[in-house]
Amino acid sequence: CDLAMGNCICK
């Protein structure tokens, strides 16, 4: 997950 980039997809 990287909130800085704007993508938070952890599975």
Curated annotation (Swiss-Prot):
Family recorded in the similarity comment: Belongs to the neurotoxin 02 (plectoxin) family.
Chain's role: Inhibits high-voltage activated calcium channels. Shifts the voltage-dependence for activation towards hyperpolarized membrane potentials for L- (Cav1), P/Q- (Cav2.1/CACNA1A) and R-type (Cav2.3/CACNA1E) calcium currents. In vivo, causes immediate agitation and clockwise gyration, followed by the gradual development of general flaccid paralysis when injected intracerebroventricular into mice at dose levels of 5 ug per mouse.
Compartments reported by the entry: Secreted
Keyword Secreted applies: yes
Disulfides per UniProt: 1-8
Superkingdom of the source species: Eukaryota
Domain notes: The presence of a 'disulfide through disulfide knot' structurally defines this protein as a knottin.
MF GO annotations: calcium channel regulator activity; toxin activity
Gene Ontology CC annotations of this record: extracellular region
Annotated keywords: Amidation, Calcium channel impairing toxin, Disulfide bond, Ion channel impairing toxin, Knottin, Neurotoxin, Secreted, Toxin, Voltage-gated calcium channel impairing toxin
Name of the molecule in the record: Omega-ctenitoxin-Pb1a
UniProt note on tissues of expression: Expressed by the venom gland.
